[in-house]
Every structure is written in structure tokens, then in C-alpha cells.
Amino acid sequence: MNIDMNTDNKKTLREITEACITGNGDDVTNSRMCIIDAEFRRGFNMLEKHPKSITFFGSARLKKESKYYKPVRDLAEKVANLGYAVVTGGGHGLMGAANQGAYEAENGTSLGINIDLPMEQTLNEYLNDSIDFHHFF
């Protein structure tokens, strides 16, 4: 079973998982492939809306007081002002700095693609849009 991500792009992770398991019964491999496929297409559908984007990759544990926070925020703001969407994992630290810069830029777009991990990050408050994943690609 496949999920139509053209019509179901806003499904939650739980809804995707339940639909894939229900549609595949006891076939664990096909259920898992269905979930991975749906998550993958969901991510591409989101990024397709932003053909010009730059990813900032870095630690969620960087403190706002760090000497690196402001330069990352400033760079992301400049990138956003050039018309690029800023993409991060949606967490705090360096990701939050980049998202903040884009979010506060004039006409900036700040995106978070968050991996759902137990006892890990929460999304930062500087996102225009975000999606969650179970699987890390």
C-alpha cells in the first residue's frame, strides 16, 4: 500500500504509520517500506515548494551566548534576503540561530525538517513550516 502524498501531505507521522500498517497487515517489511516511502515523498513535497534553499547543519546544543550564534544568525538572514529558504533540523542551538536569521529577514523562509527522537530536541520558535520524520535519511 502506498499513501498518496499529493493529497495526504499534511498527515501526521502517526496517521502515516497507521495507514501503512493497516494497508499491509502482518507484512512488516512492506509496512516499513510504505512508511519510509511516505516520509521521503513528504520531505520532497515540502522542499519542492522552495527550489532555492540552503541547509544549515550543526549542533542543537550551541548556546545563544556562544560566539558562533550571532554570525550564524546573521549569515542566515543574508541568505534569506537573497531569496533562499533556510533549512535546518528545526532544533535549537545552531539550527535555531539559522532559523532565527531567516525568520526575521524581510520575506525570509525558515524551514525545519525534524527527526523524531526520544528525549531529544523540540522545535524552535523561528519556523515558517516544519515536518517530522521517524527515519533519518
Model regions: which residues?
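Glycine-rich beta-alpha loop segments
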Residues: N2-K10, C20-T122
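Conserved phosphate- and dinucleotide-binding cores of soluble alpha/beta proteins
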Residues: P118-F137
